[in-house]
Curated annotation (Swiss-Prot):
Ranges that cross the membrane: 16-36, 50-70, 81-101, 113-133, 151-171, 181-201, 240-260, 271-291, 333-353, 369-389, 408-428, 433-453
Subcellular compartments: Cell membrane
Coiled-coil blocks: none
Comp. bias intervals (Basic and acidic residues): 310-323
Name of this protein: MFS-type transporter PUL3
Domain of life: Eukaryota
Residues covered by region (Disordered): 300-323
Gene Ontology biological process terms in this record: iron ion transport
Native species: Kluyveromyces lactis (strain ATCC 8585 / CBS 2359 / DSM 70799 / NBRC 1267 / NRRL Y-1140 / WM37) (Yeast)
Main location class: membrane
Xref: InterPro entries: MFS, MFS_Domain-Containing_Protein, MFS_trans_sf
Changes seen on gene knockout: Still produces pulcherrimin, but grows poorly when producing pulcherrimin.
Keyword terms, alphabetized: Cell membrane, Ion transport, Iron, Iron transport, Membrane, Transmembrane, Transmembrane helix, Transport
Its job: MFS-type transporer required for the uptake of iron via the uptake of the siderophore pulcherrimin-iron complex.
């Protein structure tokens, strides 16, 4: 079957979005299963606290760059070359992180800071997607593919961690082990994909905005929107923050629980997170199908009209177009609400596994498996939201300032990555430990559902 030019172009867009997801996923996950042991190896006496510092500082840098990356792309006049530069930063950060054993403990932090800056690619991708397509359905599909690819790449990242965890050799006196070999491999994989992106990425036209007033005007347009539109945008930004917060529960508590409580090795942790990521991929993969399912369930039965004038037909077509937009909006909000309930189930599993282990109700291995099931379900909810929330947010943004403002949703996700380790570390130190940390996330999910019910009743 021969593909048409439009189909080739569409598949090229799919490939580009898939490749963009690699860096963000690898930087988030490859180091994760061995970080506690690596921190110990580099000389830290308090690996839990240093893990908090690594994640919080890296997230802070990501937040800072995510807020300004849209302005940088607008200033440069090219989203493509900004993404490629961020990929190169990721290569440098991972390589530096891998060399920490030969330099100092703080080299770990330096590498993660650079990777944090590179992870602002997770924000600029929203500008890229909305710049290369104007069709709302295609945009939602691209967001779903991005989240699906990110989930698959998270699983592949753990496969890299597992395979290279078997390494144990020296190069000119420097020892390559399971602690740094995966990030060495990751750095060169990212460099290779950086080269591929030079040929695959489109370079959509971006209006160069070198006057600082243009950035202020973009923010003024956002906050001067109608009250319904502004409230809806703020609700969606909150839910993007929330989705990242319970994603960070997975990233923060997984190495702590499985390493320090269950006692699993790096390879077993890698398998656990790979399973969670693969199962979580179903969230973004089936998101478009769920939206269609919600549409079928909510579509009222209509009777055919036999006699209609031309004017009536035109009015009917216009009415149907508005109805289609409102239906898509309503069904994507329904998907977001569904995602929150899925996340609640996963968080309940995580608490149950921790309580079962602490009260000797389950053996360590069984508790680890039960905890991994909770991780998987939570990741499923996260990926549902990762597909629906950005697509909804793009509906409320003025097309003239999308390049500058769409990364804002990635920046808010970065705020979630920054706040989560601070809050979770503080709660983990209390007598209740992990259960109160995860339980706090469940409370946030619970209080967020009414705002989405309100949003579902709104019309575009």
């Amino acid at each position: 079957m021969k593909l048409t030019d439009s189909q080739k172009h569409l598949y090229s867009q799919y490939l580009a979005v898939t490749l963009i997801a690699v860096q963000f996923s690898f930087d988030t996950c490859v180091y994760l299963s061995s970080v506690v042991q690596y921190v110990k190896e580099c000389g830290s006496d308090d690996p839990e606290n240093y893990l908090f510092i690594l994640q919080a500082v890296s997230a802070a840098v990501q937040v800072f760059f995510s807020f300004i990356i849209g302005d940088i792309a607008s200033y440069v006049g090219s989203i493509k070359w900004v993404i490629i530069f961020l990929y190169f930063l990721s290569f440098v950060g991972n390589f530096l992180y891998s060399c920490a054993g030969a330099v100092s403990l703080n080299t770990l932090l330096g590498g993660r800071i650079i990777c944090g800056a590179a992870s602002s690619s997770g924000a600029v991708v929203y500008s890229y997607i909305t710049a290369i397509s104007k069709d709302r359905t295609t945009i939602f599909k691209l967001f779903s593919i991005y989240r699906t690819s990110a989930g698959i790449c998270m699983a592949l990242a753990q496969l890299v961690a597992i395979l290279f965890a078997l390494c144990d050799f020296t190069v000119r006196g420097y020892r390559i082990t399971s602690y740094n070999a995966p990030t060495f491999a990751s750095s060169f994989i990212i460099l290779l994909i950086c080269v591929l992106l030079m040929f695959v990425l489109e370079n959509p036209p971006v209006k160069s905005a070198r006057n600082p007033k243009n950035y202020l005007d973009a923010w003024k347009k956002f906050f001067s929107a109608g009250s319904n539109r502004l409230i809806a945008s703020l609700i969606l930004l909150w839910n993007m923050f929330l989705s990242t917060f319970f994603m960070c529960e997975v990233l923060y508590f997984m190495p702590i629980f499985l390493t320090l409580n269950v006692g699993w090795k790096t390879e077993y942790e890698g398998v656990a997170f790979m399973v969670s990521a693969v199962l979580g991929v179903a969230g973004s993969f089936f998101a478009p199908d769920l939206v269609k399912l919600f549409a079928k369930l909510n579509t009222p039965s209509t009777q055919d009209e036999t006699d209609t004038s031309d004017n009536d037909k035109i009015e009917k077509e216009e009415s149907e177009q508005k109805s289609d937009i409102n239906t898509l909006h309503r069904n994507q909000v329904s998907l977001t609400i569904f995602a929150l309930f899925v996340a609640l189930i996963g968080q309940a599993f995580m608490i149950g596994a921790s309580e079962a282990l602490s009260n000797d109700k389950l053996p360590k291995t069984n508790s680890g498996i039960f905890f991994t099931a909770g991780l998987s379900i939570t990741m499923l909810g996260y990926n549902f939201m990762g597909s629906s929330v950005p697509a909804l947010f793009s509906m409320y943004i003025d097309p003239q300032v999308k390049v500058q403002l769409m990364p804002f949703i990635g920046a808010i996700a970065g705020v979630g990555k920054l706040v989560a380790p601070i809050v979770l570390a503080a709660l983990y130190k209390t007598p209740l430990g992990l259960p109160i940390g995860v339980g706090f996330g469940m409370i946030l999910v619970g209080i967020s559902i009414p705002s989405l019910v309100y949003l579902r009743r709104n019309k575009m």
